[in-house]
Amino acid sequence: QKGNAGELMYTNPNHPYAVTGLTPLAESPVKSHLDIVYTAAERPSIITHGIQKAVLTYNANHDRIRMQYSDNSRNLLTRYYLGDNYELDVDSTGVHERLYLGGGYYDASAVLMKKGDISSVYFIHRDYLGSVLQIADAQGNIVEENNFDAWGCRRNPSTLKAYTIGAAPKLLLGRGYTGHEHLEMFGVINMNARLYDPVLGRFLTPDPYVQMLDFTQAFNRYSYCMNSPLCYVDENGEF
């Protein structure tokens, strides 16, 4: 039994750590089905859920540089990534730019947001894992408040209950748990090298590295941070 997900099943003896099935709870926020295509470097390339589709593009170093999100062949969002501190979104409302100040996606304390000719600075309040808990405008007004369980599942800050599918408010920065990008339309978090399901508390693909040969948890290649999410952060999906 896993929190608000339901009962997990492990029925493949050749892959004892791989989840083969799930009996979800009545209000489980886990997505029922995702089709994912990977690159030769095992990075997620195409993610499909029903009529929703995201196409991810990488550079020669396997760093994500663009995401195109569409719905029934209708482009809804194109997002560009530059370095580790700049993002540009193009959608039906125009062009939105985000430049992180004093750091990158995972540790910056402020962000300069620009839409058209209007620029605004917002201050990012994080917890010790780097998760975005609050965002304040230049006048100190709280414009966003977030809460996450230990595994990164989004919760209502007032009730501490997990949001049901489609009920979570849009993230101002598109990022939340440990500073990573939430792909709310697919119910996963993009941790760069791999996709992570915060409801299951597991990665969707195995870790290509074993970091600690003398620690049993390191051999569960689907686990997140050796099953110690309050102690460690996986910044790139591999280490």
Residue ranges and their predicted role:
Residues 1-121, 142, 157-173:
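Acidic/glycine-rich beta-solenoid
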Residues 40, 60, 128, 197-199:
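A cytosolic small-molecule/anion-sensing beta-strand core signal
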Residues 26, 40, 179-183, 195:
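Short, flexible loop/turn elements at secondary-structure junctions
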Residues 165-167, 212-221:
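A short, polar/charged loop-to-alpha-helix boundary motif
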Residues 7-12, 93, 117-192, 226, ...:
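A motif-centric feature for acidic-aromatic and gly/ser/thr-rich catalytic loops and repeats
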Residues 135, 153-158, 194-204, 208, ...:
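Short, low-complexity export/processing leader segments characterized by acidic and small residues
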